[in-house]
Amino acid sequence: MKNKGKKKKVWEKWLCLDIICIMLILVGFSYKKIEKTTMETENFREIYQEDNKDEAEETKEEKEGEDIEKEKKKVALTFDDGPHPVYTPQMLDVLKEKGVKATFFLLGEQVEKYPEIVKRMSEEGHLIGNHSYKHEQLSKLSSVQACTQVNRTNELIYSITGEYPEYLRPPFGDWKEHLDCEVNMIEVLWDVDTLDWSSKNKDKIIKKVVTNVEEGDIILMHDSYESTVDAVTEVIDLLQKEGYEFVTVDKLILE
């Protein structure tokens, strides 16, 4: 009977040891699982925080870029009386090199002579406006004559570019109101007159611009003189250093 009791106690001890071992194994497995989950959570948190940091930096950079864009002072370069067979292509070369878009107010009689230059203007993203057909003072013409000056030029430009011009600069800045014909165009004058047609002097043209220009100004030049082509190169560099951005007149008017 005593041996039987001893065997029972030994068996109970082994059973207890087995149970303890199983419990330890389960606890160890659970700990590893918790540790793995904790590490995965920490890794996810680090990745999430890093992604958020990158997104925040990108958002900040975008906002700073937008603020810089808003801070730029906009001005418009405009050229009258073209296209000229020699100097307008040179002017287009300068603008292309500088990455600047300008506005050209064209004479119909010049458009007829040099359609390939007008086509190039349009293809390179410049704005084309109407400057009448023969540069006559519209207010001194009859309504029919004034309408002819405008409409004939519109049709010529359309035949080359496929678009009717929306902007009109009347010669001498003198517009004839209440025309009998329908001329539904936006009149564009200027703020800074370089008088380049008078001086034909590069330095005087540059001085006229840099000493008078302000934000939102429209600058008047003529793409018919070598001195103007030379001046524009420096005018662009000088004004860009002062924080100016060159746009076409529609961008100024629409804002």
Locate each region found by the language model.
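Generic detector of well-ordered alpha-helical packing
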Residues: 19, 81-82, 132, 197, ...
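Terminal accessory/targeting
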Residues: 1-69, 73-75, 93-102, 215-255
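Catalytic domains of cell-wall/extracellular-matrix polysaccharide-remodeling enzymes
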Residues: 136-245, 250-255
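Active-site beta->alpha N-cap acidic-glycine motif
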Residues: 42-141, 145-146, 152, 156, ...
